[in-house]
Curated annotation (Swiss-Prot):
Entry's Gene Ontology cellular component terms: cytoplasm
Compartment(s): Cytoplasm
Function per UniProt: Functions in the N-end rule pathway of protein degradation where it conjugates Leu, Phe and, less efficiently, Met from aminoacyl-tRNAs to the N-termini of proteins containing an N-terminal arginine or lysine.
Major location (coarse): cytoplasm
Catalytic reactions of this protein: N-terminal L-lysyl-[protein] + L-leucyl-tRNA(Leu) = N-terminal L-leucyl-L-lysyl-[protein] + tRNA(Leu) + H(+); N-terminal L-arginyl-[protein] + L-leucyl-tRNA(Leu) = N-terminal L-leucyl-L-arginyl-[protein] + tRNA(Leu) + H(+); L-phenylalanyl-tRNA(Phe) + an N-terminal L-alpha-aminoacyl-[protein] = an N-terminal L-phenylalanyl-L-alpha-aminoacyl-[protein] + tRNA(Phe)
The organism's taxonomic lineage, starting at the top: Bacteria, Pseudomonadati, Pseudomonadota, Betaproteobacteria, Nitrosomonadales
Domain of life: Bacteria
Native source organism of the sequence: Nitrosomonas eutropha (strain DSM 101675 / C91 / Nm57)
Family annotation (HAMAP family): Leu_Phe_trans (MF_00688)
Name of the protein in its database record: Leucyl/phenylalanyl-tRNA--protein transferase
Length: 234
């Protein structure tokens, strides 16, 4: 059995999460900024279909990308050197979420529905949720969004309309976060795409301990303005 959350119910301990489905911890509650911030600080995230009860997850193991471990393939490195794109932050947050919600091959439905868009847009307005965007000739062609708390970034979703567009956004995000002392990018679940870029699985307990240190650092709740000049040595 999983715990049912009401407006004032705290999350249960992570070790109470189910083994199957992996990481299901609780149901109910709401998507208020306070609830979402508390969830991320503890290594919990919402994931549910439109019209269903809110489900909260903390899978074990957890997929993370340590910024200093980012891997760039030869083909992606060539694309980066061409520099025919522009990287922006927080200039089209809702557009990025809507693009991430668009139907994808072999998928039926999406978990990024209007309720989620509204909740994360509120976080964005508070300077907590952010987007990193890849633009070409004034057109948004790829990007990602997530939540920043302390020195941890929690990635939520990414999209590409042209090859490598989301990878480019992730590369620039990782480089900027490394420069600013961020400890990790939470990738939630294992994917071959993220593993190819250096992400790896760690035990949930280790992830939780890292978050305890990283999210306890001073908040910088503001719109992001990064210097996206690609280092020449790269």
């Amino acid at each position: 059995m999983i715990r049912t959350l009401f407006s004032d119910t705290p999350f249960p301990p992570l070790e109470q999460a189910l083994i199957e489905p992996n990481g299901l911890l609780a149901a109910g509650g709401d998507l208020s900024p306070e609830r979402l911030i508390s969830a991320y600080q503890q290594g919990i995230f919402p994931w549910f279909n439109q019209g269903e009860v809110i489900l909260w997850w903390s899978p074990n193991p957890r997929m993370v990308l340590f910024p200093q471990e980012l891997k760039i393939s030869r083909s992606l490195h060539k694309t980066l050197k061409k520099n025919h794109y522009q990287i922006r932050t927080d200039s089209a947050f809702t557009q990025v979420m809507q693009a991430c919600a668009a139907p994808r091959e072999k998928q039926t439905g999406t978990w990024i529905h209007p309720e989620m868009v509204a909740a994360y847009t509120t976080l964005h307005q508070r300077g907590i949720a952010h987007s990193v965007e890849t633009w070409v000739d004034g057109e948004l062609v790829g990007g990602l969004y997530g939540v920043a708390i302390g020195k941890a970034f929690f990635g939520e979703s990414m999209f590409s309309r042209v090859p490598d567009a989301s990878k480019i956004a992730l590369v620039y995000l990782a480089r900027q976060l490394e420069r600013q002392g961020y400890g990790l990018i939470d990738c939630q679940m294992k994917t071959a795409h993220l593993m190819s870029m250096g992400a790896r699985e760690i035990p949930r307990l280790q992830f939780s301990k890292l978050l305890g240190k990283l999210t306890d650092q001073p908040e910088q709740n503001r719109k992001w303005h990064f210097d996206f000049t690609w280092p020449k040595q790269q």
